Amino acid sequence: MRVIRAPAIGRAHELVVKMILEKGRVLQTEDDEATVEFEEVALQVDTPLAGPMVSPHSRFQQRFVEQYATDLLHGSHASFEYDYHGRLFDWGERLSVEGVPVHVDQIEYIAEKLKKSPVSRRAIAITWNPVIDEQLDDCPCLQLVQCTLRDGRLAMRVIFRSNDMLTAAGANMYALVQLQKSIAGRLGVPCGTYTHISLVPHIYYLRDMHDIEPFCGKGEFIQPVQEVCRACGRCPRAKTV
């Protein structure tokens, strides 16, 4: 597993995009989309609320990520196959125990667990629901959230089974850090380290070609692998690789 340490989540976003584009391998997904992917990666940010929280190279800027965070924390009226708010704050759809529907507020559980046992390693939330997700075409990428209290600070670790690091990870990190801040506020402590683990980090290099260009800077900031560079073809380097 590669570890990327950065002073802010916006910078972590830039560094992981660079790593995947320069060192990744190209393959077609089971949905027949052209991707470049890399081995497991952990993005570690000791000061997650420090700026920049959003990379200036990302298409999705402050207004978008703030709305995304609001939807995760408070829910949305939009209709999706799943949403992270429901999975974290009301887990258990279609499940029942002795005829009683399951409704688990996992974020409440995390906060209460750490209030009662500040050294606990059990303050976790999961999103996967096999009853639903094994049948979905679009199933949750975020799988697990763990919070720990160490040295008077709330650390958060998240695990993604798969993560679109170009167009999704920036908003994912921003929203989850807002969740970390919210839980820390309930406990009356500051935020500690935020660690974002992706088991299969990837970029859809054909679908999102226009999103790659601002990060790449026509080869000035990033020198992508041959297949990506040739597919783009927007700078002189594409003709030489």
Residue ranges and their predicted role:
Residues M1-V241:
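Terminal, non-catalytic protein-protein interaction segments that mediate quaternary/complex assembly
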